[in-house]
Each structure stands twice: as structure tokens, then as C-alpha cells.
Amino acid sequence: VATKRGIQYIPAIDGLRAVAVIAVILYHLGISWIPGGFLGVDLFFVISGYVITRLLLDSIQERGGLDLRDFYMARIRRLLPPLIFMIVVTSIVVGIWAPDTTKKFLTDAPFSIFGGMNWWLVFNEQDYFESSGRPPLLQHTWSLAVEAQFYLLWPLILLVVLKYFGKKVIPAAALIIAAISGIALMLVSFQLDATNTS
């Protein structure tokens, strides 16, 4: 096992990322034999959770603490430049070939940049799986927003857990948080289903 970016590098993780990418691409291409391809996004979330938690725990163990400023700045430098580049290029394309969507695009852009696109879609009752009509051009950045919110909150939660309970309870804390998140997701799904059928 090699070392990459200061943490233990596991080649199989890159393999899982490749599987997730292929699954998502095939899903969006409408391949009928892989209807659950969108779950590749969930796989990305699991991988990110594992990698970031390992990174944070290794940093705490090696330095005796966690520099939140360095962590947040590293995440910003990693995510924001390509996101802004994509938005700028898309805005040019929109202005030339789809000017009728410019207002909606400019309204959505700040929520995409500042990591709130998922909540903006919820607020506007926008169904990601809606097949009719033209979806918002930045709708896909909801997953990036979820990841950004995880980056923001998880280090704080981890520090609190370590301070008051110790390292041994981290797996239990992660399971509890996952269970709560799963219950919340299920409740939201039932609510959306009820709305769609009413």
C-alpha cells in the first residue's frame, strides 16, 4: 500500500470511483439494464466520507489536533476553481445558445458556488428525477453541495466526539449519524411521493 497526499493510499478506492463514474454515466444515458446507476453518487459519498475521516484522524494523531483553517482552505482550493470554471463556460454557452434560460441560470449560480444547491432545489420543490421539461442547468451540483456541507460539519462533529468521548466511539457516532440521516431521507422520500401522487 503506497502513500498518497500524506495518507495511506488504497488503489481499490480508485477502482470504486471508476465503477461509480461508469454507473452514473450509464444511468444518464438511459441504459435500461442499469436503472440503479444513480446510486454511484451514493458510492462517491461513502468514499469521500471514508477518505476525509481518515485524513482528519491521521492529522489529529500526527499533530495532536486539527487545523480547521488549513482543512477548509484545502477543500476550497480543490473544489471551487473547477466549479467556477464550469459555471463561467456554461454561462457563455447559455448566453449564446439558450438566452431564455439566462435568468434562471444566474439565479441558481450563487447557490451552486456557495454549496447550497441541494436546499435551493428542495425550496423550489424541484424533483431531480423529473423527466418532463428542461431541468435547471446547474441542478447536478446538488451532490457537490452535499459534499461541501459534509466538509463543513463533519470535522466539527469529529472534534466534539473526540474531545468528550474519545476515539473509540467514532464508529458508533458515525453509525448513529448515518441512521438519523437515513431516517430523514426516508421521511423526505415519503413526503415527495405523497406530493407527486396527490
Feature map (PLM): residue ranges:
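Membrane-interface helix/loop caps of multi-pass membrane proteins
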Residues: 1-198
